[in-house]
UniProtKB/Swiss-Prot annotation:
Protein name: Cytoplasmic dynein 1 intermediate chain 2
SMART domains listed in its UniProt record: WD40
A single BP term in Gene Ontology: microtubule-based movement
Main subcellular location of this protein, as a coarse class: cytoplasm
This protein's encoding gene: DYNC1I2
Species this chain originates from: Homo sapiens (Human)
Region forming the signal peptide: none
Length: 638
């Protein structure tokens, strides 16, 4: 590195020397031109003086003519008169001898010679007695004054806007050379400078030693630069633009049927990393509320790679067509749940199998957690399957629940000790083994949880009835997913929630009744997750162990799903998450792959009457359930 800097310094010194030589040549040339100009001025000076005299004479003649006098008319001033100008042939120039003889005459006034300037021409003054003419009488003359207004000069300005062309300094110097050419450098000096520059350019770069290379590779500045730059380069290389897209719509003729159906699911993206995703199970998915294109996915341990970290959380980017994760985080315990910290766009929260809550920060160059909760009785000691940030910008908490029924409330600024903790116990019996949790929209106190024994519970965090409130029975297997109604509209459906279970069913519930409103039984395997659409009131999605994604629009049909698609290879789908816009949906499988699907507009975007239609659908469901209960009641006595 030092040799390279010395070469650069030597080249700069030579360039400065070349500039000094050019400046010296330019100064000498200017001095030479100045001397030549002075000599020319001295040679032209007499001619200019003569021309000035002629100009003065013409002005005098013009003045006399304006007064009514002609140059031929002599003007008498006392005893002298001025003759008109004579031709060079008729001029009489008196010599000193003649002057002397005239002065020695009989007392007459002799001729006098008047020298106006250095010009050899002479004006002679004669007495009146020599020519015998009398004096001329002068009189007053009328003067007519004429004013000529100055010529009016009309100007206008015209401007044209042109783009500014930024030129480097070298180009500006070249332009200056074109306008004012510099004196050429002597061939010998120019050749010497060119040879030096060529030698400097051809000089081989300094070869770094292995120790220097390792020092650079492990420096903090290089790691930060490399991490940032590779992310940008990957985005640029992964972009694929369809240059053959036809805006006239001819390309869509073959897809006319699908467009009219509007309920098709189309593949958008697939996320998979050979090192961090292979042989790992996707345990949780979550979309960022600050950056909607970012998706965090948590992964279980890889049994085929015992030396790799057990827990991994990858942040994927939907905006760019890159195949690698935006961020890679890991810890020493399998990550069972993960979420973006709402109101903190740089933080990712994870719940681990060991019971620790870990916190990653994408502003840090470390892939390991920047904070973690202690492994003590004050916190969790069982697997944490549920983490969620609830509250507002100025008052929010991290809520976590472990499988031993313990719920803790944390401040993201301090994870050393929970702010509040509570045991979820139903009627003083054993603790509830929570597997899933969901908060209604806008509620931070009341929530619902699913358990391993198949029961669903409502609970609250504060108040006189803190803890488990009611129990809902209906599933015949462990609850795998639970989600409260999320679409906000003209009618409030926040009392509704759906659950999925190992009993191959999805059930619709209301907090107003401890029996399920409806049971969706179209699946032939475990249903691992379920989620309401964030924008459509009657739409929810579920995934099962056969690799099938189902979309149910209850306003259209309650017996069969509105749209279904199976992932290639039919891996078990563990998690499903809608984007905040409701136009895309992400699913994670048991092989570590994440698939993003685009949802058709006619099924994803609700019409204005969807809330009213869903209200009528619920009324029909309640009526059918009441009829079924009455029929069952009549059959029991028989």
């Amino acid at each position: 590195m030092s040799d390279k800097s010395e070469l650069k310094a030597e080249l700069e010194r030579k360039k400065q020397r070349l500039a000094q030589i050019r400046e010296e040549k330019k100064r000498k040339e200017e001095e030479r031109k100045k001397k030549e100009t002075d000599q020319k001025k001295e040679a032209v000076a007499p001619v200019q003086e003569e021309s000035d005299l002629e100009k003065k004479r013409r002005e005098a003649e013009a003045l006399l003519q304006s007064m009514g006098l002609t140059p031929e008319s002599p003007i008498v001033f006392s005893e002298y008169w001025v003759p008109p100008p004579m031709s060079p042939s008729s001029k009489s120039v008196s010599t000193p001898s003649e002057a002397g003889s005239q002065d020695s005459g009989d007392g007459a006034v002799g001729s006098r010679t008047l020298h106006w300037d250095t010009d050899p021409s002479v004006l002679q003054l004669h007495s009146d007695s020599d020519l015998g003419r009398g004096p001329i009488k002068l009189g007053m003359a009328k003067i007519t004054q004429v004013d000529f207004p100055p010529r009016e000069i009309v100007t206008y300005t015209k401007e044209t806007q042109t783009p500014v062309m930024a030129q480097p300094k070298e180009d500006e110097e070249e332009d200056d050379d074109v306008v004012a050419p510099k004196p050429p450098i002597e061939p010998e000096e120019e050749k010497t400078l060119k040879k030096d520059e060529e030698n400097d350019s051809k000089a081989p770069p300094h070869e770094l030693t292995e120790e220097e290379k390792q020092q650079i590779l492990h420096s903090e500045e290089f790691l930060s630069f490399f991490d940032h730059s590779t992310r940008i380069v990957e985005r640029a290389l992964s972009e694929q633009i369809n240059i053959f897209f036809d805006y006239s719509g001819r390309d869509l003729e073959d897809k006319e049927g699908e467009i009219q159906a509007g309920a098709k699911l189309s593949l958008n993206r697939q996320f998979f990393d050979e090192r961090w995703s292979k042989h790992r199970v996707v345990s949780c998915l979550d979309w960022s509320s600050q950056y909607p294109e970012l998706l965090v996915a948590s992964y279980n341990n890889n049994e085929d790679a015992p030396h790799e970290p057990d827990g991994v959380a990858l942040v994927w980017n939907m905006k760019y067509k890159k195949t690698t994760p935006e961020y890679v985080f890991h810890c020493q315990s399998a990550v069972m749940s993960a979420t973006f910290a709402k109101f903190h766009p740089n933080l990712v929260v994870g719940g681990t199998y060991s019971g620790q809550i870990v916190l990653w920060d994408n502003r840090s160059n470390k892939r390991t957690p920047v904070q973690r909760t202690p492994l003590s009785a004050a916190a969790h000691t069982h697997p944490v399957y549920c983490v969620n940030v609830v509250g507002t910008q100025n008052a929010h908490n991290l809520i976590s629940i472990s499988t031993d029924g313990k719920i803790c409330s944390w401040s993201l600024d301090m994870l050393s000790h929970p702010q509040d903790s509570m045991e979820l116990v139903h009627k003083q019996s054993k603790a509830v083994a929570v597997t899933s949790m969901s908060f209604p929209v806008g509620d931070v106190n009341n929530f619902v949880v699913g358990s391993e024994e198949g029961s669903v519970y409502t609970a609250c965090r504060h108040g006189s009835k803190a803890g488990i409130s009611e129990m809902f029975e209906g599933h015949q297997g462990p609850i795998t997913g639970i989600h409260c109604h999320a679409a906000v509209g003209a009618v409030d459906f926040s009392h509704l929630f759906v659950t999925s279970s190992f009993d191959w069913t999805v059930k619709l519930w209301t907090t107003k009744n401890n029996k399920p409103l409806y049971s969706f039984e179209d699946n032939a395997d475990y249903v691992y997750d379920v989620m309401w659409s964030p924008t459509h009131p009657a739409l929810f999605a579920c995934v099962d162990g056969m690799g099938r994604l189902d979309l149910w629009n209850l306003n259209n049909d309650t017996e069969v799903p509105t749209a279904s698609i199976s992932v290639e290879g039919n891996p078990a789908l563990n998690r499903v998450r809608w984007t905040h816009s409701g136009r895309e949906i992400a699913v994670g499988d048991s092989e570590g792959q994440i698939v993003i699907y685009d949802v058709g507009e006619q099924i994803a975007v609700p019409r204005n009457d969807e809330w009213a239609r869903f209200g009528r659908t619920l009324a029909e469901i309640n009526a059918n359930r009441a009829d079924a209960e009455e029929e069952a009641a009549t059959r029991i006595p028989a």
